[in-house]
A protein has these predicted regions:
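HhH-family (HhH-GPD) DNA N-glycosylase catalytic core used in base-excision repair
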Residues: 2-387
Length: 387
């Protein structure tokens, strides 16, 4: 099933009421339910990619008791619903895996507004990704079959994903968090992420002064102008029939988008056959994959290491990297944005790694090394057979 078809099924389930859900028509209400794929788990699939720590997103961890039942945590998001204005949504999954999401807004929303809010949630949580696509990933990389990991959190719109990626280049994670917080506070309706129209109307100098975006100021405004004018056709970029290389080339033509940013935006579009290589890739190559040499050579070797996963290579790379972060900071679904998110600096990670290495006289990454070695061994026969 194509991604677009899966999305249509999810939304039609909600429109028809889903399993006990209120149809998105009639009088304005504050709460409704959203049907999800059978394998979907809110706490696992929200806390799967770093953007869940960036405003206007907020994850509120639950207590240990509800985690044991598999139903913990609240996902909170301020959404811009156009003419309906901004709304703060609180999303939970009270009945656990595969059960409907419960969505509660801070204001009563019309059927049209709830439909738009649901569409944004669908994109963020990748509810339009069919379970068989996740199963295809697990068949290639069995390390993540038991946990069910496969979906990667993203933004409510393509525009937001592009801008968040621009704010994540050549800067610390603290800087990325700060830029997104200030963008939402200064130019977002009610704290939502700013629309293309809003940012297109801002002078680059004002954007730099109010949001600390530095050299990105003019590029962000240019991107906003292109999205607002229709020069960037979101439907074309989201069309799965377009070859990855063609989409990548088109991304690189956009202001502020280089090879790393393009590879990252590709995975945000659901194209997992590319790995965005950066300094974190080098650190991972050295600490987990036991690679030696210059940063440039390690970066290339990391790319080659995951090439055997083909169209799923980003997911294999990312979840391996994510597990490393979790060994340092605990399971991602227990992270609090202002406490844990703010500690993702090179110095803090290095210090945490050193502390972990001293525990019980063993390296903190030994389990990851064993998993990585086992995965590499399983890939070798497949490569030989394909020659």
């Amino acid at each position: 099933m194509a991604r677009g078809a899966a999305r249509k099924l999810v939304l039609s389930g909600v429109l028809a009421g889903g399993s006990g859900a209120a149809p998105l028509t009639g009088r304005a209400v504050k709460s409704w339910r959203v049907a999800v794929p059978a394998d979907f788990v809110l706490w696992r699939d929200v806390c799967s990619y770093g953007y869940f720590l960036l405003e206007p997103n907020l994850w509120l961890p639950g207590s240990g008791g509800v985690w044991a039942a598999g139903v913990g945590g609240v996902f909170r998001r301020i959404v811009d619903l156009g003419a309906a204005g901004p709304a703060r949504l609180e999303v939970t999954q009270p009945e656990g895996k595969g059960a409907d999401l419960s969505v509660v807004a801070d204001t009563a929303l019309s059927g049209a507004a709830r439909h738009e809010a649901t569409a944004q949630l669908t994109r963020m949580l990748r509810l339009d990704e069919a379970p068989h696509n996740i199963a295809a990933f697990h068949s290639l990389d069995r390390r993540y079959k038991k946990s069910g990991r496969g979906r990667l959190f993203r933004s409510a719109t393509f525009f937001e994903d592009v801008i968040k990626t621009v704010t994540n280049c050549n800067v610390t994670w603290l800087g990325t968090m700060s830029m997104n917080r200030r963008l939402c506070g200064a130019f977002g309706a009610g704290g939502a992420f700013p629309t293309p129209a809003r940012l297109a109307a801002v002078r680059p100098a004002a954007l730099r002064a109010q949001c600390g975006v530095g050299y990105r100021d003019a590029r962000i405004v240019q991107l906003a102008e292109m999205f607002e004018s229709g020069a960037v056709d979101e439907a074309w970029f989201a069309d799965s029939s377009q070859p990855d290389d063609v989409v990548r080339d088109a991304l690189i033509e956009l202001p502020g988008i280089g090879p790393y940013a393009a590879a990252n935006i590709l995975q945000l579009l659901g194209r997992y056959g590319h790995v965005p290589l950066d300094t974190e890739s080098v650190r991972h190559g050295r600490t987990v994959l036991a690679m030696r040499g210059s940063s440039e050579s390690i970066m290339k070797r990391v790319g080659k290491h995951f090439a055997g996963y083909g169209e799923q290579r980003f997911r294999s790379y990312w979840f391996e990297l994510w597990e490393c972060y979790e060994l340092l900071r605990g399971p991602a679904w227990t992270w609090e944005r202002e406490k844990v998110g703010a500690t993702f600096t090179a110095a803090a990670i290095k210090k945490a790694m050193a502390a972990k290495s001293g525990e019980s006289g063993c390296k903190f990454n030994a389990p990851l090394k064993r998993k990585a070695a086992g995965a590499a061994a399983r890939k070798r026969p497949a490569r030989a057979a394909s020659r």
